[in-house]
Structure formats: C-alpha cells, structure tokens
Design a protein with these regions (language model features):
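Short substrate-entry loop that stabilizes the transition state in hydrolases
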Residues: 73-80, 90, 105
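N-terminal cap/lid segment of alpha/beta-hydrolase-fold proteins
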Residues: 19-62
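Short beta-to-alpha linker loops that shape the active-site pocket of alpha/beta-hydrolase fold enzymes
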Residues: 73, 100-104, 172
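Short beta-strand element of the alpha/beta-hydrolase
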Residues: 64-72
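Alpha/beta-hydrolase-fold enzymes
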Residues: 138-201
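Short, hydrophobic alpha-helix immediately C-terminal to the catalytic nucleophile
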Residues: 83, 87, 124, 128, ...
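Catalytic nucleophile-loop/oxyanion-hole region of alpha/beta-hydrolase
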Residues: 88, 102-138
Length: 201
C-alpha cells in the first residue's frame, strides 16, 4: 500500500508566498488537463431524499487499484485540481472515480441538505457502492473531504478489505482552529467571499 502511494507522489515544494497564495493561484488559474478521457456517470443513493453523482474514468491497466478522489469545500468533480490529478492518474493507467459530495457539482439539487465535515456516512456509502464494482480502492480526500476520510477511518467501523490505502491532503483536522485561522487571517475577507460564492452557486 505505502509503496503504491510513494509511486504516486513526488516531493512537495510549496509555492512562493505560502499556502494562501497557492490556494488562490490554484483556483483562479486551473490550467487544462492534458488527458480528458470519457467519464461514466454513476448515481449513488445516500439517503431517502439524497443522491450523489460520481464519474468514473476507466482503467487502462486493470491490475492497478482504482483511485477515488474527493474534493474540498466549495469544490466538485469539475474542480481544476481534481481534473488535473485525474488526468495524471489516467495517463498512468489508473481507473479514477471523481465523486461529488452531497449537494455538490452534478448532485446539486438532488439532496435536501448539504455535506459538512461530519459526512462520513455519505463517504461510506460511496465506498461501498464502488467496492461492489472494483476489487481494490485507494482513497484520496482533499481539504474538508480529507477530514471526512480520516473520520471514516477512525470511527471504529470494519474497514472493507478492498480498501487498500488512503491519503488525506491538507485536512483541517481541528475544524475550530482551521475556521479561526481562515476568519482572522489578513486575507480572510477574500477567502470568505470566494467560498460563499462557491457555496451559493
């Protein structure tokens, strides 16, 4: 499992200007994926009144695990960073699953509520859904979905044997502290406006 993750990851070098500037640049200048394969849609029942739409890029190398990508707050399966990573993984032969959290992306309007930092049951249902279709999954959660992924793994549930690895990218492990930093940083007005616009859309 760890060797597999090591092969996927390069040494991280932060952008000049720190994390805030990197977040802004990544969202405002998304670039174009080099590889845009056909995506197969999946409709997943999360609750009686909630559905999620996820998309699958089929594997070229059937011996490799399928990788599930979970977006951060205000994002969706169409977010630039999700598509860039999916494109790179697809070029390496991996099957890729691009999920949308409850009320996000293509699932907007299909739920009576929105996802939050405690939505581990939604993630569990998506994992179970895809494990019925793929024998081995590797999970990658970004930002708030990274926090949900850690919550899913640490709740004492029985972890399915087909789940062979998990990677949490920049998770706000302490949501209260993360909220305080975003709210009090000198650039907080910019982040609040940016996220409120994303959530409102």
């Amino acid at each position: 499992m760890f060797l597999e993750i090591d092969r996927l990851m390069n040494t991280f070098v932060p952008a000049p200007g720190g994390a805030f500037l990197q977040t802004i640049i990544g969202s405002q200048f998304p670039g174009k994926p080099k590889f845009l394969p056909e995506k197969i849609p999946h409709t997943i029942d999360l609750d009686v009144d909630a559905k999620s739409i996820a998309f699958e890029i089929q594997a070229v190398d059937k011996d490799k695990p399928t990788i599930l990508l979970a977006h951060g707050m205000g994002g969706c399966s169409e977010s630039g960073y999700i598509k860039r990573i999916a494109a790179k993984l697809g070029l390496q032969g991996y099957g890729v699953l691009l999920i949308n959290q409850r009320g996000s992306g293509s699932g907007m309007g299909l739920s009576s509520s929105l996802w939050n930092g405690g939505s581990s049951e939604d993630l569990a249902k998506m994992i179970d859904y895809f494990l019925m279709r793929h024998p081995h999954l590797l999970l990658i959660g970004f930002s708030l979905s990274g926090n949900i992924l850690l919550k899913y793994l640490g709740e004492g549930r029985s972890i399915p044997p087909g789940l062979i690895g998990a990677l949490s990218v920049n998770p706000p492990v302490d949501l209260r502290v993360a909220s305080h930093i975003i709210s009090t940083h000198r650039s907080s007005w910019l982040f609040n406006r940016y996220y409120m616009r994303l959530i409102g859309n």
